[in-house]
Amino acid sequence: MITKADKNATRKKRHARVRAKLTGTAERPRLNVFRSNQHIYAQVIDDVNGVTLVSASTLDKDLALNGTSNIEAATKVGESVAKRAVEXGVKEVVFDRGGYLYHGRVKALAEAAREAGLQF
């Protein structure tokens, strides 16, 4: 019998493998991306202290969004999280794509964060 693999379960396994090798420090925190069907979330995390330094998502009221699950929204979230991180004194991050392919909304968020001043 042919069984179809659960995409989210395989993503979680992939993310766990990557997270075993990735850690964010106070000097170079981790930029984590979570993508749902309706929204996209980004956090800058210091894993040593277990603290989220800044975050942004499509749920933020200050972002004027037409849709929340498209590339334009991901771009605005990337710009927003990068601006907040630079204001908090973070210039370099480690990018954690969350087990997702570096394509589409994840890629748009990453490129917007780079253009807004984060280095990774």
Curated annotation (Swiss-Prot):
CDD domains: Ribosomal_L18_L5e. GO terms for cellular component: cytosolic large ribosomal subunit. InterPro entries: Ribosomal_uL18_bac-type, Ribosomal_uL18_bac/euk. One of its GO terms (biological process) is translation. Keywords: Ribonucleoprotein, Ribosomal protein, RNA-binding, rRNA-binding. Gene3D superfamilies: 3.30.420.100. GO terms for molecular function: 5S rRNA binding; structural constituent of ribosome. Part of the 50S ribosomal subunit; part of the 5S rRNA/L5/L18/L25 subcomplex. Contacts the 5S and 23S rRNAs. This is one of the proteins that bind and probably mediate the attachment of the 5S RNA into the large ribosomal subunit, where it forms part of the central protuberance. NCBIfam families: L18_bact (TIGR00060). This is Large ribosomal subunit protein uL18. It comes from Bacillus cereus (strain AH820).
